[in-house]
């Protein structure tokens, strides 16, 4: 434990907090270009084919981003908007693609939680 005199001289150092989304460089979202669109399998208790894309961001970093929702229209060279948010059962996936923004279409026929998936209200 420091003495009062040592605290007067040096003071306390703040602990630097580590960011969970370093590739966004402090921005809420970043634009990027898909370099590869593929499926991958989740960690142990779960079983599925999760849709993910490798994206080269405008911050010059390449990240793996999850494509949420049922079905998608993404392919190589698609321009996408990437936000933070990890997928718990996919190791190394710390970003999600925003549906309904740029080249990504919203989920067709979605009636609940539409704004999360960029789905327009269906006509009656």
From Swiss-Prot:
Domain of life from the UniProt record: Bacteria
Cited Gene3D superfamilies: Nucleic acid-binding proteins (2.40.50.140)
Keywords noted in UniProt: Methylation, Ribonucleoprotein, Ribosomal protein, RNA-binding, rRNA-binding, tRNA-binding
Stretch list, region Disordered: 1-32, 105-124
One Gene Ontology molecular-function label: tRNA binding
Listed Basic residues bias regions: 111-124
Residues recorded with modification 3-methylthioaspartic acid: 89
One Pfam family recorded for the sequence: Ribosom_S12_S23
Any Gene Ontology biological process: translation
Gene Ontology terms: cellular component: small ribosomal subunit
UniProt cross-references to InterPro entries, sorted A to Z: NA-bd_OB-fold, Ribosomal_uS12, Ribosomal_uS12_bac
Function: With S4 and S5 plays an important role in translational accuracy. Interacts with and stabilizes bases of the 16S rRNA that are involved in tRNA selection in the A site and with the mRNA backbone. Located at the interface of the 30S and 50S subunits, it traverses the body of the 30S subunit contacting proteins on the other side and probably holding the rRNA structure together. The combined cluster of proteins S8, S12 and S17 appears to hold together the shoulder and platform of the 30S subunit.
Subunit structure: Part of the 30S ribosomal subunit. Contacts proteins S8 and S17. May interact with IF1 in the 30S initiation complex.
NCBIfam families hit by this protein: rpsL_bact
Protein family (similarity comment): Belongs to the universal ribosomal protein uS12 family.
Protein's recorded name: Small ribosomal subunit protein uS12
């Amino acid at each position: 434990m420091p003495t009062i005199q040592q605290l007067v001289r040096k003071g306390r150092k703040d602990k630097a907090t580590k960011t969970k989304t370093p590739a966004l460089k402090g921005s809420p979202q970043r634009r990027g270009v898909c370099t590869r669109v593929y499926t991958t399998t989740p960690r142990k208790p779960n079983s599925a084919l999760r849709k993910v894309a490798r994206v080269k961001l405008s911050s010059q970093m390449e990240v793996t981003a999850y494509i949420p929702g049922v079905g998608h229209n993404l392919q190589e060279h698609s321009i996408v908007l990437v936000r933070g948010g990890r997928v718990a059962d996919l190791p190394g996936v710390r970003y999600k693609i925003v549906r309904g923004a740029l080249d990504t279409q919203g989920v067709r026929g979605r009636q609940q939680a539409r704004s999360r998936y960029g789905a327009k209200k269906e006509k009656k």
